[in-house]
Structure formats: C-alpha cells, structure tokens
Amino acid sequence: MKPKIFIDGEHGTTGLQIRTRLAERDDLEVISIPEAERRNKDLRADYLRAADIAILCLPDDASKEAVSLLEGHNSTRIIDTSTAHRVHPDWAYGFAELAKGQRERIAEARLVANPGCYPTGAIALVRPLCDAGLLPADYPVSVNAVSGYTGGGKQLIAQMEDRNHPDYLAANNFLYGLPLKHKHVPELQLHGRLDRRPIFSPSVGRFPQGMIVQVPLFLSELEGSPSLAKVHAVLTEHYAGQDIVEVVPLEESAKLPRVDAEELAGKDGMKLFVFGTEDHGQVNLVALLDNLGKGASGAAVQNMNLMLGK
C-alpha cells in the first residue's frame, strides 16, 4: 500500500507548494479534505488519523490544535511547518544537515518540526562554527536577511501584487521585526547553539521567491583568530557529501561582484559563501536559498522522504 499523506492547510502558500510537488509522485497517496469542509473539526480529525504522515501548513495555534486531535493516535506521524514546536524537546528539528545523525533522528521521529526559512540559512552558517569551537557560544551574533515576499503568505502577497489592495505596499524593500522580537529567534538561538540571544534584522524585497541571510563576524573574536580559509574549511567539512547544501569555493566567492537573492528561486538547494578580508579581520558568512524551497516546502518534502525511508 502507498503511504497516505494529508496536508492540513493545503490551500496556503506552503501547502500549495507541497501539494504541487506531491502531485507528481506515484509512490504516495495524497488525501485531501473537501475545501468546503476545511473547518469541520471532526472531519479534519478523521483525515489526520487516516494519514501515515500529516503535514501541517497552518498558523501556530491551528497546528497545536491539529496535534491535539491526534492525541492517543500515535500511528500518524507529523511534520509541522509552523513555529509552534521548533524548540520543543519532543520534536525532531527538521534540518537534515544540522549535525551528524540528524537525518537519522528525522527518519525515526514521529514528530518533526520543519525549520523556519531565515533560521535555515543562519543556523547553516553558525552551527558548524560553534560545533568546531571557532564561534564562542556567547559571541554577539547579528543576522541580517532579505526574503522574497511570498514568505509572508497570502496576505503579504496580495499587498505586494494587488495595486487596488487597501493596504498595498509600494516599497521595493522594507525592514520589519523592528523591536527585535521576531518569532524565529528562539529556534535560531537554540539550534545555532548560541548562549546569547542573537540580533535578527529581517527584511522583505519586491521579488516573490529567494533569500539572502548574512552573518558578519570579527575574526579576532573567534577562537584562535582563524583565517578565512579556516572558516571556509570548517563549513566545507561539515557539509561534505551533502547534495542540497553547497559551500562555494573560496576562490570562486572572491571573484563574485554580487549575490542575487533570486538565484535559487524555485530550487531546493542552499549555497553558503565566505566573504571578507583578512586585512581588516572581518568575515561575512552568506546563505542563499529559496524561502519556499529549502526554507519551507522543499524541506518538508525532504523530511517526509526521510521519514518514509526514501
């Protein structure tokens, strides 16, 4: 029998992307609740319990409700794309390249929390340095990022695309999360292994999909004052053999005049760059990804495949 997959929230931005991806698969059976019955709690519970894997593409509170509907029904495994369970100790963090053994943890887990798009890039940069002892856990990390506007869901998409929308946004780029209380910070701190709460400054650009995440560091404040080559070597070793995360060669990065946030739009990969100058003792770590790819639906499908042993 084919594994049954239920996408709870398949009409949202991430849910639609996952549904489209799975439509091409003949090794799965995707079960869908009739659109008119989406708010029927009892019927939703039936679909959740009928699934081998339920992928939750819902706001935090709705995801928590969906999980509660499965209490006492442990045969359904869950992938939650919301922020609700990303720092919960009972949930496996769904970043397969996070550390040695993480793929196996995801594959064996019943509960998997899909990472946020911004933390995916930031954690990909800082976690290997922390694990290698280069980045002190109390380093005052700052993360700057720009995302395509689809990351804000249907409401922001409408505000950016519909000129007749009452709250139309004409800006080509805008900062948000100005009080430094973005909901992604807790998972960034926990899974990045940072003792000090990082400063996170997100922004949105006038492009649908794509993302750049930057983490600037002072080499002199890292353990042993490493060279750019050493920092690059740590990242390269950490992601050796990974087919989704690519560490761009140092000499190739040095020749780049720019990095395009949309380069990986529509793709599931992630590129990591090491830029900087040893003359001034500064390095800028950069992650490039699709906010809806490795940053959302692509990661969810990757986690689903791991859970199915594929």
Swiss-Prot record:
It comes from the Bacteria. GO terms for molecular function: N-acetyl-gamma-glutamyl-phosphate reductase activity; NAD binding. One of its GO terms (cellular component) is cytoplasm. The keyword Oxidoreductase applies. Its EC number is 1.2.1.38. The active site is at residue 117. Catalyzes the NADPH-dependent reduction of N-acetyl-5-glutamyl phosphate to yield N-acetyl-L-glutamate 5-semialdehyde. This is N-acetyl-gamma-glutamyl-phosphate reductase. It comes from Brucella ovis (strain ATCC 25840 / 63/290 / NCTC 10512). The gene is argC.
